[in-house]
């Protein structure tokens, strides 16, 4: 079964996310558990936690199909030790917030070398940060998102994801989220059945579908290999609708959250319905 949704607002409180997802016909959703552009946030109250969990049950959402995203400020590969520690502490706080809400996944961008160290050194710093974060927390899986390769961001090659996974000591608490726009602008084609099969076979060989815990479904404004991160509405960008039809009929992608981060949220309900309409009868 496919679980399609979108990254919904937590305006007014994290407890509002489930009803915002329900309102667009979602079967999954993503959210921030705090303001994503601030280092610290007030703790989630017991009342908020109770209401969040009650609404999850009421609207039929399952924690495993819910994909929280961490703050954009966090850089677990920051070459500056003090700044890396600040990121680590913030990441641990985000993992603890997920645990409080009963959510077993936390999606994050791997990190950036800021042109101060080489890629392998930065990947090793990310691994070290993750191992420290996992030691300080329990239960929540850290889900690495592949990136567009913009600037000095790592994670744009499947080999980067594999490097991080290889270094993480507790393999049960590491996973991957593939973003279709990021995958495409990083140089992996998805536009035809042949190209899609080749890219997914490469992912299986380098990383493995056993680690895939979610996907972000976004069309792309830039072209293949552009290494620029600009999402577009489904069918309006360079990927086109065929990519998403292939995803909706790929049995390997059953049971994980498939999350829209397309640019016009007024279209999300329509895009979710479109994706489900693409499913072919078995």
From Swiss-Prot:
Pfam families the UniProt entry points to: AP_endonuc_2 (PF01261)
Keywords, ordered alphabetically: DNA damage, DNA repair, Endonuclease, Hydrolase, Metal-binding, Nuclease, Zinc
Residue sites binding Zn(2+) 2 per the record: 145, 179, 216, 261
Required co-factors: Zn(2+)
EC number(s) from the headed UniProt entry: 3.1.21.2
Enzyme class: hydrolase
Zinc keyword on record: yes
InterPro entries registered for this protein in UniProt: AP_endonuc_2, AP_endonuc_F2_Zn_BS, Xyl_isomerase-like_sf, Xyl_isomerase-like_TIM-brl
Catalytic activity: Endonucleolytic cleavage to 5'-phosphooligonucleotide end-products
An example molecular function term from Gene Ontology annotations: deoxyribonuclease IV (phage-T4-induced) activity
Gene Ontology biological process terms, A to Z: base-excision repair
Domain of life of the source: Bacteria
Cofactor comment text: Binds 3 Zn(2+) ions.
Residue sites binding Zn(2+) 3 per the record: 182, 229, 231
Binding positions for Zn(2+) 1 per the UniProt entry: 69, 109, 145
Family: Belongs to the AP endonuclease 2 family.
NCBIfam families (UniProt xref): nfo, PRK01060.1-4
Function: Endonuclease IV plays a role in DNA repair. It cleaves phosphodiester bonds at apurinic or apyrimidinic (AP) sites, generating a 3'-hydroxyl group and a 5'-terminal sugar phosphate.
Protein name: Probable endonuclease 4
Gene symbol of the encoding locus: nfo
